[in-house]
């Protein structure tokens, strides 16, 4: 019996090592490598307090159709607070990791890219993508190759939409409007903290 028990130990350890990693916090210091992969280091107290919300929908709640392709594709109002000290600008990325089918996701679809949002900014008004951004803020290219917000338009099922704001210790400069990948590469080593809001959407059945 002792031999059997000892033999089981490696099996149990192997099983534990194959379990899914614990999800990272949605706030803290994020480092983005050149491949666009983000890793998270120990956050400062101010970074841990950083948060983003929207008056349009609750965290993990359903996004109203007004803000989707079935409505007017209006960008929702976003608000954030308790940004880390030393913030020189904010960047915003909105994407959908469930494309095209949440049961078999194959890619992350990018809906909005904004950068050089002034450090004193604490919110973006509704429809900010169409002339309502603060002075100095610029829009990058989404996956429709447009410099604006493109609302949720999932072909299959209910998708998640991640609204991610990053506090940076610098402004960013690009020769041409950046993609999400361009922005993530430029942010590498400059992220003081980040906050995340998730909304969901599924097209109305006809």
Question: How does the language model describe each region?
Answer:
Residues 16-206:
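N-terminus-centered regions that define maturation/targeting leaders and the start
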Residues 4-5, 48:
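Generic detector of short alpha-helix boundary/capping microenvironments
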